[in-house]
Amino acid sequence: SEKYGIKGAMVSAVDLTKGLGIYIGMEILNVPGVTGYLDTNYVGKAEYSLEALERVDLVYIHVEAPDEASHAGNYKDKIKAIEDFDALVVGTVLRGIKAFEDYRVLVMPDHPTPIEVRTHTDEPVPFVIYDSREKKNNKGAVFSEEILNAEGVVKIQHGHELMDYFIRG
């Protein structure tokens, strides 16, 4: 909050992540049923986050289920976790956030955890940012490694630089 002059909140089932949020002055949203696994309360995370945006400028929603499925080496659970995250968190947020005048949404994993190795790796992390003020129409756009490596795609060299890019544009 000091660096950017904004207030933030976060929701996570992971104590380490919540501790980091507390350390930087974020409000911790205590959502019932948040587990860090496939049975987590995805919709609750999104709804509590949207409600928090009435009083804070930024909400960080951490979802652990895809990472846990990767550590277990379970590709079916990882697919389910990503699909649930997309439909129940991202979908809920994108529908609800339209009530706000201007907004930006950043979606990304916190780190890669390939199923093949069952641990975190240091590959680049893909991200997508939606800015309601931009009038580009990318409806139906798809993701591929080829697109990710294309000329003109924003690449952030160091992870700590992403927040500057997201906040300041």
Please identify what each model-predicted range represents:
Residues 1-169:
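Feature captures the catalytic ectodomains and active-site-proximal regions of enzymes
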